[in-house]
Amino acid sequence: MDEELKNLIKVWVSAIISISYCYYIPPRIKSGAPRFLSVSPVLALFLVLPLFFSSLHLSLITAFFLTWLANFKLILFSFDKGPLIPIPTNFPRFFCFTCFPIKVQQNPKSQNHLPKLVFAIKLAIFAVLLHLYSYRQNLSPTILLGLYFVHLYLEIEIILTFVKVVVFISLGCDLEPQSNKPYLATSLQDFWGRRWNLMVPAILRPAVYAPMRRVSERKMSSGWALFPGILAAFIVSGLVHELLFFYLIREMPTGEVTLFFVLHGVCTAVELAVKKKTTVAQRWRLSPGVSRVLTVGFVFVTGGWLFTPQLKRSGVMERFTSEAVLLVEFIKR
């Protein structure tokens, strides 16, 4: 643990120095290829930093914040696009909005408060979940898989809520939520675009979807050009997840997780095409309850088929849950 804490300090001091360079130097360079070249050493460094950790949690969190979010935001920043344009007014804001999955609320509410009851319930469920792992040998694979998905959702929610609160206290500005009750999604488009991990689609839209759609519009109508954009965004997301899996497993990718996102990209595109191009979908609509069951069920089944097998084969799922239990015990002390 002591060695991991030392690595944590080294990694994030390196991140602070790198982001400070990006704040003071590249903005003075012409946008486009010249500015991209100026930030490319930072992009390369952020690809390496997660490898400094043996802890799954520290490696994954660092990879998500730096390798994925920060790198994509800096690439967009190189071309005067994305959430870093206009450039934040001071370095602390620039650092937070570069590294963390947050953005300023466009229409701030008069009162911004943490939904304490909901957060407390999530913490309680997470505590019960960690306790259930003591009996994992008595649980069926299907139930255990369900627990893993709930664990993933709750841990992401808890970590991102803490980040949001710390940044809100530090910067004093209203921040948009990181997710919007993904378990209530009524379609794949609703799940991936408006409910799950909202900062990711907010980055993929300008970085991947919009450029691909513009290119596709040269060959087809604008109504059809959105489908290559959707598929491209899911493919890029799959490739990034392969990289995240590499940081966890330290083995060559198998392509399963990319296939998971390609499948969801194709299904989302088909779903959208049916809604837009057929009158049957407009006349015949499922009830919200049935739509939610089908959507969440599809994510669960395909996740068990393609997303988690590599993690289970490598023992990462067991290590990840055991590490969470040890972390809670460490905090209690």
Swiss-Prot record:
Molecular function per GO: long-chain-alcohol O-fatty-acyltransferase activity
Transmembrane segments: 7-27, 45-65, 114-134, 143-163, 229-249, 254-274, 288-308
Subcellular location: Membrane
EC number: 2.3.1.75
Chief site of localization: membrane
Any one of the GO BP annotations: lipid metabolic process
Keywords on record: Acyltransferase, Lipid biosynthesis, Lipid metabolism, Membrane, Transferase, Transmembrane, Transmembrane helix
Cellular component terms (Gene Ontology): membrane
Cross-referenced InterPro entries: Wax_synthase, Wax_synthase_dom, Wax_synthase_Magnoliopsida
Domain of life: Eukaryota
Membrane association type: Multi-pass membrane protein
Catalytic activity: a long chain fatty alcohol + a fatty acyl-CoA = a wax ester + CoA
UniProt record similarity statement: Belongs to the wax synthase family.
Its job: Catalyzes the final step in the synthesis of long-chain linear esters (waxes).
Protein name (record): Probable long-chain-alcohol O-fatty-acyltransferase 5
Protein species of origin: Arabidopsis thaliana (Mouse-ear cress)
Higher taxonomy: Eukaryota, Viridiplantae, Streptophyta, Embryophyta, Tracheophyta
